[in-house]
Amino acid sequence: METATLVAIFISGSLVSFTGYALYTAFGQPSQQLRDPFEEHGD
């Protein structure tokens, strides 16, 4: 394969992996440990 193709595939795969990890962290099991500053601030 050509070098440019491999670089494009690597960058695309990295972006997809990062996006998947970010969504898992935001909405998956680890999201239970995140704090919500709006709930901590009682009006």
Swiss-Prot record:
A biological-process GO annotation: photosynthesis
Protein name: Protein PsbN
Main localisation: plastid
Pfam family, one: PsbN
PANTHER family the record matches: PROTEIN PSBN
Function: May play a role in photosystem I and II biogenesis.
Membrane topology: Single-pass membrane protein
InterPro entries in alphabetical order: PSII_PsbN
A Gene Ontology term for the protein's cellular component: chloroplast thylakoid membrane
Top-level taxonomy: Eukaryota, Viridiplantae, Streptophyta, Embryophyta, Tracheophyta
Top-rank taxon, per record: Eukaryota
Annotated organism of origin: Buxus microphylla (Littleleaf boxwood)
HAMAP family, alphabetized: PSII_PsbN
Keyword vocabulary terms for this entry: Chloroplast, Membrane, Plastid, Thylakoid, Transmembrane, Transmembrane helix
Protein family (similarity comment): Belongs to the PsbN family.
Transmembrane segments: 5-27
Cellular compartment(s): Plastid, Chloroplast thylakoid membrane
